[in-house]
Amino acid sequence: MNEVSVIKEGWLHKRGEYIKTWRPRYFLLKSDGSFIGYKERPEAPDQTLPPLNNFSVAECQLMKTERPRPNTFVIRCLQWTTVIERTFHVDSPDEREEWMRAIQMVANSLKQRGPGEDAMDYKCGSPSDSSTSEMMEVAVNKARAKVTMNDFDYLKLLGKGTFGKVILVREKATGRYYAMKILRKEVIIAKDEVAHTVTESRVLQNTRHPFLTALKYAFQTHDRLCFVMEYANGGELFFHLSRERVFTEDRARFYGAEIVSALEYLHSRDVVYRDIKLENLMLDKDGHIKITDFGLCKEGISDGATMKTFCGTPEYLAPEVLEDNDYGRAVDWWGLGVVMYEMMCGRLPFYNQDHERLFELILMEEIRFPRTLGPEAKSLLAGLLKKDPKQRLGGGPSDAKEVMEHRFFLSINWQDVVQKKLLPPFKPQVTSEVDTRYFDDEFTAQSITITPPDRYDSLDPLELDQRTHFPQFSYSASIRE
């Protein structure tokens, strides 16, 4: 067991992920890859004071830029299948070089340790991400045959964003249908500024839960990263709610219970999902919930390595996320509160087109309920949408149990939930696996344009050079089935 030591420490200015202000943080970079930020300089490196920022530099990509401030550097990596960034600046070019060299050295040493050694549970991102080792293990495809683009028929476009697209595909060998998320490498790699790139996929290898989308394969082409995931064709919950405007409390209770069951499973494995929102909640063909990771940045990335525009759905952000403080499992209970409020009230709990005003509402505004809402539902939502994560329902040490024991869920048998014994309140009227009536025809009506598959199997040396940014980015579920 290697002893963890502090490699470098000092003051950095960290840019808020959402409220784009710069905050001074005292950071410790440790030999195990952890990169921990405090409001004040800690008296001792091993002190128990909780940090405000806690993530890992293992297998990250480093970039430097002079925007939006001189001497800025960016740490970028994949969180599940979504690109995330953290931005810092220092006072001088020399100081920036020192930090980048130190981070690079730690990342390299972790990479060289090899499987089974200390600190090989590659983690990245925020505090919640940094404990996702079980679901983000290094994936090396030892399957008998390598998966390529040629192995699939491309049927319909399901979604599209700045980073890439999600396509309904059919695996030729088995006839099975999947959703393939295709990310363009050029938006993940800032070509001339890469000091170190993501070198292995962090994938949802070990998820085994009825309400979580499973990953079947991950592979790459010369210019794409591809994730082949379970396909749920009942459509987004967002699609159904926008049609019906509001769900009955019973219907919301059913969906809420399945989401709680999935979150309990993730939290028991020290994984915080972080992104509960209607668009990430799908229905399968029978009407059960499937939490997906199809997230595509809809608002885009402007030019420059660090110019990340607001990407994501700000209406769902918890107060502690906005304040850029360390956050844990309670962030998921806030997300549950927002989606259940939408289901039962027909609108978001906090909304304003102006992001700054919206953030103010999330941080300060008291929650309001329609008169038609029952007392148990009001009590549940008020508990889930408490501003202080420590006071929030589910924010205590018993986590999901607190939520499960709330009187709103009194009629729910949780064993029956996980065993799918409860009858879904709505069964999607799909006629076949390729029936996409519950997907937005803005996408499904479009023709699919991807580079012809044969292009991927005859890479020239220049194209192979780009592949070296993502060595061993491959995975097949069959190796553990």
Curated annotation (Swiss-Prot):
Q: Which residues carry this modification: Phosphoserine?
A: S34, S126, S447, S474, S478
Keywords, sorted A to Z: Acetylation, Apoptosis, ATP-binding, Carbohydrate metabolism, Cell membrane, Cytoplasm, Developmental protein, Disulfide bond, Endosome, Glucose metabolism, Glycogen biosynthesis, Glycogen metabolism, Glycoprotein, Kinase, Manganese, Membrane, Metal-binding, Nucleotide-binding, Nucleus, Phosphoprotein, Serine/threonine-protein kinase, Sugar transport, Transferase, Translation regulation, Transport, Ubl conjugation
Q: Which residues bind ATP?
A: L158, G159, K160, G161, T162, F163, G164, K165, V166, K181
Specify the signal sequence span.
none
Give the taxonomic lineage as stored in the record: Eukaryota, Metazoa, Chordata, Craniata, Vertebrata
Going by the UniProt annotation, this protein carries glycans at S128, S131, T306, T313, S474
**Quaternary context:** Interacts with BTBD10. Interacts with KCTD20. Interacts (via PH domain) with MTCP1, TCL1A and TCL1B; this interaction may facilitate AKT2 oligomerization and phosphorylation, hence increasing kinase activity. Interacts with PHB2; this interaction may be important for myogenic differentiation. Interacts (when phosphorylated) with CLIP3/ClipR-59; this interaction promotes cell membrane localization. Interacts with WDFY2 (via WD repeats 1-3).
Q: What is this protein called?
A: RAC-beta serine/threonine-protein kinase
Residues annotated as the enzyme's active site: D275 (proton acceptor)
Q: How is its activity regulated?
A: Two specific sites, one in the kinase domain (Thr-309) and the other in the C-terminal regulatory region (Ser-474), need to be phosphorylated for its full activation. AKT2 phosphorylation of PKP1 is induced by insulin. Inhibited by Akt inhibitor MK2206.
**GO BP of this protein:** cellular response to high light intensity; cellular response to insulin stimulus; glucose metabolic process; glycogen biosynthetic process; insulin receptor signaling pathway; negative regulation of long-chain fatty acid import across plasma membrane; negative regulation of PERK-mediated unfolded protein response; peripheral nervous system myelin maintenance
Q: Tell whether Kinase is among the UniProt keywords.
A: yes
Q: Which residues carry this modification: Phosphothreonine?
A: T309, T451
Gene Ontology molecular function: any one:
protein serine/threonine kinase activity
Query: Which residues does the UniProt record annotate as the domain Protein kinase?
Result: 152-409
- Which parts pass through the membrane? none
Q: Which Pfam families match?
A: PH, Pkinase, Pkinase_C
Tell me where in this chain the PH domain is found. Answer: 5-108
This protein's species is: Mus musculus
Q: Which reaction does it catalyse?
A: L-seryl-[protein] + ATP = O-phospho-L-seryl-[protein] + ADP + H(+); L-threonyl-[protein] + ATP = O-phospho-L-threonyl-[protein] + ADP + H(+)
